[in-house]
Structures are given as C-alpha cells and as structure tokens.
Amino acid sequence: MAKRKKKEVFDWEDEDQEEIIWVSKSEIKRDAEDLKQLGEKIVNLTKANLAKIPLDESLLDAIELAQRLQKEARRRQLQYIGKLFRGIDVEPIREALDKIENKHNQQQAMLHKIEKVRDELVEKGDVALTDLLNDYPNGDRQQLRNLIRSAQKELEQNKPSKAYREIYQMLKVLMLED
C-alpha cells in the first residue's frame, strides 16, 4: 500500500512564508477583466489618439490587428491584449488614456476660467489686468486696456457688449497658446 503524503503546513512564524501575499482567484479574474476592458478602450481609439499612448511594438501590433478583426476573432484578440498588459506597467497607459478621454472636460474648464478672468478684468480694471499680464506676459496691455474701458462703458449704457466678446476672444488666444 502506498504511503500518503502529509499536507504542507504553513508556518506563520517563518519570515520567508510571512511575506507571501495571498490573492484570490476572483481578484485575479477581476484584474484580468479590467485589463481586457482597458485594451478594448484603446482598440476603439482613432489612429491619432493611439499615437499619444506609450505602447511597445508588440502591443501596438496586437491593437492594430484587433482594430481590423470582427466578432469572435476580435474577442480572442482582446483577451490576448489583456494578457500582454499583465506583463507590463499599465499606469502610464491609463494616464495617457485619461488625458485623451478628459480632454473635453479640460477644455470646458479652461473656457470657464477665461470667462471668469474676463469678468474680473471688467470689474476690477487695471489691477486685474496687471495680475493677468504677470501670468501671461505676451498679452497686449494697451489693446486689453482699451477693450476693458469700452466694455465698462457698454455696461454702464446698457448697450450690447461687443468689447466684452472681443476681450473673451483675445484672452482665449492668449491663454490657450501657453
């Protein structure tokens, strides 16, 4: 009769065994699914946006192939891309993808900032203009000062604010070029 092997007992006092991190099978599957979804987002990007993401050559080839495939072949290719992601650090890729996805939100925030600066310029005048030109030295002080005065006069006379819109356009050019 064959002898039974004793089960290996985990020794909690042993420092080598203490450093082992136990990961459940479910957690491994969740991580793999997350990487597969990341791969799917990247596969759905345009060529111009894909060029902005730091990818190595094998991963880029796999993504370009997945863009050409359909149905089941595409699903298998996405699984393969997820597998490739497991072997590399995906944080720079996630950051680049977030920048691409949030570009619209960043532009909206910048436009709101421009509106706020314009309102401040019209309300406070030269003080706000000096602060603005400290931050953006390429601005034309004289032209901005004239537009601010015109906008203030238009507000006092309840006229349509042409200068107000011109200030906005000038600030947009000034602030978006930096």
Curated annotation (Swiss-Prot):
Q: Where in the cell is it found?
A: Cytoplasm
Q: What is its main location?
A: cytoplasm
Quote the SUPFAM superfamilies the UniProt record gives: PSPTO4464-like
Q: Output the Gene Ontology cellular-component terms.
A: cytosol
The GO terms describing molecular function are: ribosome binding; rRNA binding
Q: Which residues cross the membrane?
A: none
Superkingdom of the source? Answer: Bacteria
Q: What are the alphabetically sorted keywords of the record? A: Cytoplasm, Ribosome biogenesis, RNA-binding, rRNA-binding
InterPro entries from the UniProt entry: DarP, DarP_sf
BP GO annotations: assembly of large subunit precursor of preribosome
Assigned protein family? Belongs to the DarP family.
Summarizing the function annotation, the protein's role is: Member of a network of 50S ribosomal subunit biogenesis factors which assembles along the 30S-50S interface, preventing incorrect 23S rRNA structures from forming. Promotes peptidyl transferase center (PTC) maturation.
What name is this protein filed under? Dual-action ribosomal maturation protein DarP
* Native species: Haemophilus influenzae (strain ATCC 51907 / DSM 11121 / KW20 / Rd)
